[in-house]
């Protein structure tokens, strides 16, 4: 994920991030299934999706902690 995309994610609301997180988890499931059946064309996509999931979870957690401080 590029820095520009990361800034866009940080500026979006938690509901949108949760929806995006669900979409990425579904995509990761499909990619793993394709890997197991030998149909996966781009194995690097798994790494990219996992990294995006981690970044979104981090953003959600940061917002949660920020809300607790206030």
Swiss-Prot record:
State whether keyword Ribosomal protein applies: yes
Entry keyword Amino-acid biosynthesis: no
- Which GO biological process annotations does it have? translation
The GO terms describing molecular function are: structural constituent of ribosome
- Segments spanning the bilayer are none
Alphabetized Gene3D superfamilies for the sequence? 1.10.287.310
GO CC aspect terms: cytosolic large ribosomal subunit
Q: Which CDD domains would you find in this protein's record?
A: Ribosomal_L29_HIP
Name the HAMAP family for this protein: Ribosomal_uL29 (MF_00374)
Its protein name is Large ribosomal subunit protein uL29
What organism does this protein naturally occur in? Clostridium beijerinckii (strain ATCC 51743 / NCIMB 8052)
């Amino acid at each position: 994920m590029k820095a520009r995309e990361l800034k866009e994610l940080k500026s979006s609301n938690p509901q949108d991030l949760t929806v995006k997180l669900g979409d990425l988890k579904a995509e990761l499931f499909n990619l793993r299934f394709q890997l197991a059946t030998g149909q996966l064309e781009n194995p690097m996509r798994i790494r990219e999706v996992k990294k995006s999931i981690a970044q979104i979870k981090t953003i959600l957690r940061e917002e949660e902690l920020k809300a607790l401080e206030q």
